[in-house]
Amino acid sequence: MSSEITEGDLQKFHDEHFNAKAVNLWNVAFAQNDRGGNSESANVEYTQSVERYPDGTIRTLTDEQILWFRESEKRELMWKKEKEQLLKEKELRQKALDKERMVSSKPETNPKTPISLKELKDIEIYQNQFHYSAYEILEEEKILDNIFRKFTALPIKYWPATPIRG
């Protein structure tokens, strides 16, 4: 078996792996200019072998590339719409949460006012219905108020947040 590669072997390999159009473009672009050939005739051959649009513009993208770009643009537009929709939903949720916070954070109109006789009668109705005395109901309300204060108080002191360095 001979380890030498002949010119015929190279020609056979070349013919099997490179198409005629690619070889022609290579020769037009590089080979003739290196040999000092006529560059104008090379440009004419090159421009004749390139695909053109009906208006004469040279076509630089294949149909597959154009399709891919269109699909990517469609995907990008869909993502933008989804993002806008998510932002709107988030904004609506935030507005609803802010409204809820405003309603729940309104101060009492008359805090720590003594209980009136009408309220005591209402408490007596509750006592008959739920079997609690007025005193027990008031104590339970105080306990619930204290629990509320405990959980809504901020345990963090914000000043100074970071050590002051000179």
Curated annotation (Swiss-Prot):
Q: Please give the organism.
A: Schizosaccharomyces pombe (strain 972 / ATCC 24843)
User: What subcellular compartments does it reside in?
Assistant: Cytoplasm; Nucleus
Disulphides: none
Q: How does it assemble?
A: Part of the core SMN complex at least composed of smn1, yip11/gem2, gem6, gem7 and gem8. Interacts with smn1; the interaction is direct. Interacts with gem7; the interaction is direct.
GO CC terms for this protein?
Answer: cytosol; nucleus; SMN complex
Q: Which gene encodes it?
A: gem8
Protein name as catalogued: Uncharacterized protein C16H5.15
Q: Which UniProt keywords apply?
A: Cytoplasm, mRNA processing, mRNA splicing, Nucleus
Provide the primary localization: cytoplasm
Observed effect of gene inactivation? Inviable cell population. Degron-mediated knockdown leads to decreased cellular levels of Sm-class snRNPs and defects in spliceosome activity.
Q: Which InterPro entries does the entry link to?
A: DUF3807
Main function: The SMN complex catalyzes the assembly of small nuclear ribonucleoproteins (snRNPs), the building blocks of the spliceosome, and thereby plays an important role in the splicing of cellular pre-mRNAs. Most spliceosomal snRNPs contain a common set of Sm proteins SNRPB, SNRPD1, SNRPD2, SNRPD3, SNRPE, SNRPF and SNRPG that assemble in a heptameric protein ring on the Sm site of the small nuclear RNA to form the core snRNP (Sm core).
Q: Sorted alphabetically, which PANTHER family does this protein's record hold?
A: YALI0F31295P
**Entries under Pfam families matching the protein:** DUF3807
